[in-house]
């Protein structure tokens, strides 16, 4: 990709990854502008000192920007972060689900709200230090014969002439891969995103930082949720919600026997052992949470095993639309729009990357075309740390899909993301649903 005179907004967290990303982009010829989001309200600033968007992080990012010779700005996103990430985090626990705030922050803030700042600064792209590969593919110019064989084969079988899209892949460094956290990004976001670290490993990144004498070269990676001190989410929820908003209730085992009482359904997650009443010969685990009755259901390890579940708010990527299409795409069924539709069918601003359909405006596939065929086999990750397992994915109505696991898995947790892969290519993903029939109803 020719980077001449193209301007990039780089999200800088003050860590080694985004710092080296800035250096790599600069070396590739991009005009780089560093931006750090301030996401902490002023009254919470003391607990943000060592966080990725806290005061020290801002100072570190500013120092790196100065060393690289790029401008640096701080943008206040505290109100939006509170509304879109923290409130979501708390409300999911109140609903008996276990949230994934990193996915939400990427979609809504880093690659969402930040785009308005990027446009104001005259930027063409947003870049981050994520470990993932985003390939920008232009499949020809409207002439079927113009689609290079190499592009068609490298992009999960896409041979649709004249369609511009982005393919999300796992990082070369599988231990650090973060493609899972980017699954919910829409094409309008992926097509304007750059992830320069995707083809590098963490040791290589640190070595580059040391060679540049960056002070953050050996900075320790954050291993916890950035807004939860000490990774103690229960204390955070008590502070954020207040004890009176906790939903107290009763604990039952899977046979319907009363076990005890609890101080709030928000304090539990599927697979949890800590904090449960004793008195059982075998270890007890949380196997279900019922927000309607505020009941916590416990069982033994075998009760955590699941062979099928559903996901909703599914976001399919072009790799799935094409590699698993039910039939060849029909030119007569295309829909011209000036924006890219989100899952709620509301349109956002046009992508900065025009699609090469010879002046006929931007295009997107119809809803029917954007679904893969009814069922196919893929690899599914049910949490970030999960290695992935073979599954049969069946598309359902209303942006839902059913995941069948030939090899049943432990602790499939409602509220977490299930991300679907074909080898290293992200096909899509969605949010794990709670079983429609509660455990005690069986």
Q: What kind of region is each of these model predictions?
A:
Residues 1-183, 194, 204, 286:
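ATP-dependent adenylation/nucleotidyltransferase module used to activate substrates
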Residues 127-134, 138, 148-154, 163-330, ...:
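AMP-forming adenylation/ATP pyrophosphatase catalytic core
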């Amino acid at each position: 990709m020719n980077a001449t005179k193209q301007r990039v907004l780089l999200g800088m967290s003050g860590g080694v990854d985004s710092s080296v990303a800035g250096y790599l982009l600069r070396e590739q010829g991009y005009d780089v502008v560093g931006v750090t989001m301030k996401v902490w309200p002023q009254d919470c600033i003391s607990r943000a000192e060592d966080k990725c968007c806290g005061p020290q992080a801002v100072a570190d990012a500013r120092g790196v920007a100065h060393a690289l010779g790029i401008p640096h700005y701080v943008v206040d996103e505290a109100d939006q972060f509170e509304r879109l990430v923290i409130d979501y985090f708390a409300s999911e626990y109140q609903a008996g689900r276990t949230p994934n705030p990193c996915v939400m922050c990427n979609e809504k803030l880093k690659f969402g709200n930040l785009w308005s700042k990027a446009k104001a600064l005259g930027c063409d792209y947003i870049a981050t230090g994520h470990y993932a590969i985003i390939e920008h593919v232009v499949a020809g110019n409207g002439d079927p014969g113009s689609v290079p064989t190499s592009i068609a084969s490298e992009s999960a079988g896409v041979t649709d002439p004249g369609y511009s899209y982005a393919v999300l892949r796992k990082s070369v460094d599988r231990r650090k891969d973060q493609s899972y956290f980017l699954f919910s990004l829409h094409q309008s976001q992926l097509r304007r995103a750059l992830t320069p670290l995707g083809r590098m490993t963490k040791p290589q990144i640190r070595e580059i930082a040391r060679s540049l004498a960056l002070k953050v070269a050996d900075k320790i990676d954050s291993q916890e949720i950035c807004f939860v001190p000490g990774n103690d989410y229960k204390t955070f929820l008590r502070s954020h919600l207040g004890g009176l908003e906790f939903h107290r209730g009763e604990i039952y085992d899977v046979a319907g026997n009363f076990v005890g009482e609890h101080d709030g359904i928000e304090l539990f997650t599927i697979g949890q052992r800590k904090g449960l009443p004793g008195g059982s010969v075998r270890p007890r685990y949380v196997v279900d949470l019922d927000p309607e009755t505020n009941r916590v259901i416990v069982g033994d390890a075998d009760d955590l095993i699941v062979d099928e579940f559903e996901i909703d708010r599914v976001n399919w990527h072009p790799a799935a639309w094409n590699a698993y299409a039910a039939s060849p795409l029909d030119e007569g069924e295309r829909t011209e729009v000036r924006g890219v539709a989100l899952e709620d069918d509301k349109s956002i601003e046009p992508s900065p990357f025009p699609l090469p359909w010879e002046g006929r405006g931007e295009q997107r596939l119809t809803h029917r075309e954007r679904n893969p065929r009814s069922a196919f086999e893929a690899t599914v990750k049910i949490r970030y740390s999960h290695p992935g397992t073979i599954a049969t994915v069946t598309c359902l109505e209303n942006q839902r899909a059913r995941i069948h696991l030939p090899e049943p898995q432990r602790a499939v947790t409602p509220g977490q993301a299930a991300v679907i892969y074909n080898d290293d290519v992200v096909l899509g993903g969605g949010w794990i649903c709670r079983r429609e029939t509660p455990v005690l109803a069986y």
